[in-house]
Design a protein with these regions (language model features):
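Short, well-ordered loop/turn sites that connect or cap secondary structure elements
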Residues: 200-201, 220
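Structural motif
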Residues: 223-224
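Forkhead-associated
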Residues: 192-193, 200
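Ferredoxin-like alpha/beta domains used as RNA- or RNAP-binding modules
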Residues: 1-189, 212, 219, 232-256
Length: 256
């Protein structure tokens, strides 16, 4: 299993370098598929050897967790091109009889179609509908074949009308901590024990601003985004204020 994982890791690294080299040598833009946080970390590890080609990351919407990397610089190449990313609106045929559907429900239905995970980006689910970002190469297939999610019959259509609908509304909470260490803030936001918080770091499940964070004592700054895989993400939205008891009070926007 370890050898298999190492092989996949090396293949991903090679893919990044191949795409960067092809962009640079042929004077064209090249694209990855959608990358999750762990694959993005591999990209950032390799980034010093890729930056010569120029690159841009984009996931289709603000604060996307899954992104596509485009290699190539429009200033150097002399032209611009869009990312091959489209948005699909998934809605019930009969809302009255539709289930309340979760992100997991929509993702499971998509994976049952047999498509690669790398062709699918963020899924913004709410109530009985969702907005899905995917590669344009699979959009028609999804629209033609995704007809049911859980027990709900659905229709799919490519849309550009999603900017307002897709704004996830975070829950703003005020927490008090001894310090802005990332492990302490995670413990307070999710009401974890210190041991459970530290376990997230040991298993590589904490990302700060899209980068793997292995240093649990890292001090967070206002505006930084923390992803705790499996639990959600949050953003420090204000400056810390000292309380009368010497603790730090800070506002956090929590995305469940």
């Amino acid at each position: 299993m370890a050898q298999e994982n190492e092989k996949e890791l090396q293949q991903l690294k090679n893919r990044f370098h191949d795409l960067a080299e092809r962009s640079h040598a042929q004077g064209v833009f090249t694209f990855t598929g959608f990358l999750g946080l762990s694959d993005q970390e591999v990209f950032w590890q390799e980034e010093p050897g890729l930056r010569y080609a120029g690159y841009t990351l984009y996931g289709g919407c603000d604060q996307a967790d899954r992104v596509v990397v485009r290699f190539g610089d429009s200033g150097e190449l002399g032209y611009e091109t869009d990312f091959p990313v489209v948005c699909i609106h998934i809605a019930p045929l009969a809302e009255k009889f539709a289930d309340e559907l979760t992100h997991r429900d929509f993702l499971g239905a998509l994976m049952n179609l047999g498509i690669e995970r790398s062709t699918v980006g963020d899924i913004r689910a709410g109530g009985k509908q969702a907005y899905l970002f995917c590669l344009d190469s699979v959009a028609s297939f999804i629209c033609d074949n995704l007809i049911q999610v859980k027990h709900t019959r659905v229709r799919c259509s490519v849309t550009k009308d999603f900017q307002d609908i897709l704004q996830e509304e975070p829950e703003t909470v005020n927490i008090q901590v001894q310090s802005l260490r990332v492990d302490a803030v995670i413990s307070r936001v999710y009401n974890f024990s210190r041991e459970k918080s530290l376990a997230l770091f040991r298993t590589g499940k904490v990302y700060v601003n899209g980068r793997l964070c292995e240093n649990n004592s890292r001090i967070l700054k206002s505006g930084e985004t923390v992803n705790a895989r499996g639990f959600g993400k949050f953003v420090l939205t204000g400056e810390a204020r000292e309380t009368r008891k010497g603790r730090l009070a800070v506002d956090v926007a929590v995305y469940r």
